[in-house]
Structures are given as structure tokens and as C-alpha cells.
């Protein structure tokens, strides 16, 4: 009697900032495990999402965008991305097709740290050219696809839309086929290895970014200071602190008469309740901590620093 082969392995999602890696991860898992904003470089940790099927379990690692910026926080983000890449059985390189079709000269700049490592890879590599939903005339993508195929001849290059889930079935067939044979590493109902407190903090941070968009710089972090589950009540009490680097940033987050932080709290509470499947009492506070993006000890306390 033949038994169906079960496969299990790790996949790293890498690429420049704002390519859509977190949107892709959520689309592949079928649930929200990574925050999604319109601002680049919002993924700071290695976000792990788990897809379980009868024939396979794939553990996806969403990583901070690979870029060449300076500063201790940015160097830490880059280190996290490379660590995930080294641990994977296969790689997905995510690129913003819309950006590089409109501005092809930016491609060399944005993928410079990836060109040689990907060309030398012996593991399977899939290059996903994302955001094809923005183009009615698909022939406009051909020059970019041909350029990438010539750059990385061993990789599988194809267009997709993480937002509309176009190409996801094809991507999953490829990825599952690349995974080594083996039993599942996690229970089939587990979709992430992240603690719920961390995911809660990420939801709050997502709402801050989306609410303030271009006005707020990246020097924002969220820490859960209190987490209390009341016995006999289907409710969780959460107190979260939003850290900013300047007093002027604090005013932005709070807003006139507290209007902005109230809206952030309402939107965050909704998503947290969906995550926990419980009622949530959420209190948000804003504190100034100048220079925190260069304070390695503080970043470690927030769980932002990778193992060294």
C-alpha cells in the first residue's frame, strides 16, 4: 500500500522594503500573521507563519526588507533577514513589479545586496514579481521578467499579485515540491510561532503606521506593559505603550484632543479581538524615549534584536 509522501520545510521571504512580503505571507497562510502598511520597512522581526496541509507543512519566515541604509536599527534588521535566509530550505525573492516596470533604473540599486548571493544559491529560489494587478497590459512586464531571468538563470521567475492572490496556487505547488520529506514540526491548527503578546503589539504598531502614514518616522515601537486575563470572564485587559523618539512625535500620535490615539485604539482593539477571540479592554499610552533606535539594550527588551 502506497502512502502519500509528506513534506516539511522552511522558506524565507526576502527582498527590498515594501515589496509586499507581509501581504504574501498572509495570503499564503490564509490568515493575518504579519502587519501590512503602505510604508516600507515595517517588518522588524522574523515573522513566522505556518501553512499545514495533508501532504505538507511549510514554515514561512517573513523578514525585514533587505536594503543598504545605515544606523543600528537598520543593521539589526538586515542581520535578521540574513539569518532567516541562512536557515531556509528554499527562498522566495519578492520584488515590486509596479515600481521596477515604471522605474527600471531603480532595480540595480534596490537589489544590489541580493544579486550575488542569489546567483550563487544552490537551494531552490522563486522570484515573485508582485503587484501585477496594477497592469492591464501584461506585456509591459516582459522586459522585467526577462531581465530577472537573465540575472538569476537558476531561479523560477513569475508574476503574481499577493493582494488579489493571483499566482498563489502556482507558487504553493512550487514551494511544496521543494520541501524535503519529513513529518510536520507544528500542530496543524497552529499558524504562527509568535506569542500573542507580540502579535498584539504588532497590531497596534500597524494602526499607528497606517493612521499617520508619511507624517510619522520609523522611530516608533510598541511594548505590552500589562496583560491580564480575568478568571471567569471572556476578557483580556491590555495596556500598551507606544514609544516615540521626539516630543513632537508624541503629539502626532495623540492628535488634537486625543482623537488620533482614540482611532488607533478602536481599530487595534477590533483586530486584537479577532486574534484572541475574546473581548479586549485596550489602553494606549505614548512615551518619549529619545535615541531608542541606537539603544541596543532597549531594542532587546522589545524583542527587536536577533541572536548574535
Swiss-Prot record:
Its placement in the membrane is given as: Peripheral membrane protein
Q: Where is this region: G4?
A: 130-133
The keyword Disulfide bond is annotated on this UniProt entry: no
Which controlled-vocabulary keywords does the entry list? Cell inner membrane, Cell membrane, Cytoplasm, GTP-binding, Membrane, Nucleotide-binding, Ribosome biogenesis, RNA-binding, rRNA-binding
Mainly localized where?
cytoplasm
Q: Domain of life, per the record?
A: Bacteria
Q: Which residues bind GTP?
A: 15-22, 62-66, 130-133
> Positions of the region G2?
41-45
Q: Which family does it belong to?
A: Belongs to the TRAFAC class TrmE-Era-EngA-EngB-Septin-like GTPase superfamily. Era GTPase family.
Kindly state the subunit structure of this protein.
Answer: Monomer.
Q: What is this protein called?
A: GTPase Era
Gene encoding the protein: era
